[in-house]
Amino acid sequence: MRNISMATLALTTVLSTGLFAADDLPGKGITVKPVQSTISEETFQTLLVSKALEKLGYTVDKPSEVDYNVGYTSIANGDATFTAVNWQPLHDDMYQAAGGDAKFYRQGVYVSGAAQGYLIDKKTAERYHITRLDQLKDPKLAKLFDTNGDGKADLTGCNPGWGCDSVINHQIQAYGLGDTVNHNQGNYAALIADTIARYKQGKSVIFFTWTPYWVSDVLVPGRDVVWLQVPFSSLPGKQKGTDTKLPNGANYGFPVNNMRIVANKDWAEKNPAAAKLFAIMKLPLADINAQNLRMHQGEASQQDIERHVNGWINAHQAQFDGWLNAARAAAK
């Protein structure tokens, strides 16, 4: 009788272990295809989501790097699964054009408090009393930021297709700057590197940037550069009519954005564990800034970023495990 009891116990243990493993890995056998933009600094927050999905049993491909509008279309069509870099409201036009809420699952806020705007070097701002972008209607002030000899201010701007590009183009016209300001577009990383080099040479600079990103850790607002305000709120497309004025009365031209995880709606409905994960993950903006600075300082390989992600998980293990437990519970 003792032998039978032990055998029964052993069998029960095996079965329960198997059942636990199945519950533990609700994504087993399912492949996930993440997308992000070509901004390599977005890899950190994307990989953090991928690592969590892998812990749930999903097979997660390396993120595809595409333009934002292509990414949204790919997710809507089911050719990609999710993006962790949906800027809201900056990307509202692209989100709606690709199908909006009918095609996408979007719940929760992954990163909050993302800022954007225009900055100039502090030395020039103080010497010429420049506090607002529309002051560059004055050709004499605009010429201070001329880099190519045409007499216009050369604003280091936003890559085509990022969303901020259309805002900058709109605001240049709205604030009457078409004759005095050039919006320099191309490879932002190369343009901002040139801008920083000019700053270090003591030259006047004007540029657009955003957080989370490393630029504000190199050209520090308040120390090296200052944010410029705008004369009034003016945004294009779906953001038209949005008041960008802050509670303290300052107006930097852009609303504070949240970064959200967007997934294919049909896929999310079939994968409640992943859907729950997408809804509850949260990453502090300051942590992305810190990681992006490490990339700028040379730790920018895929292995480096993987190490950064694993380090973040180790430092926030209880929170990470809590996300996984909630996701597993949603699948039951």
Swiss-Prot record:
Q: What happens when the gene is disrupted?
A: Uptake of glycine betaine and choline is completely abolished in the ousA-ousB double mutant.
Gene Ontology terms: biological process: amino acid transport
Question: Which compartment or compartments is the protein found in?
Answer: Periplasm
Q: Which Pfam families match?
A: OpuAC (PF04069)
The record's induction entry says: Induced by increased medium osmolality. Repressed by glycine betaine.
Per UniProt, the keywords (alphabetical) are: Amino-acid transport, Periplasm, Signal, Transport
Q: Which GO terms describe its molecular function?
A: transmembrane transporter activity
Q: Which InterPro entries match?
A: ABC_Gly_betaine_transp_sub-bd
> Carries keyword Transmembrane?
no
Q: Is Protease included in the keywords of this UniProt record?
A: no
Task: Show the GO cellular component annotation of the record.
Answer: ATP-binding cassette (ABC) transporter complex; periplasmic space
Q: Which superkingdom, per the lineage?
A: Bacteria
What residue stretch is flagged as signal peptide?
A: 1-21
Q: What does this protein do?
A: Part of the OusB ABC transporter complex involved in glycine betaine and choline uptake. Binds glycine betaine.
Q: How would you summarize the oligomeric state and partners of this protein?
A: The complex is composed of two ATP-binding proteins (OusV), two transmembrane proteins (OusW) and a solute-binding protein (OusX).
Protein's recorded name: Glycine betaine-binding periplasmic protein OusX
Species of origin reads Dickeya dadantii (strain 3937)
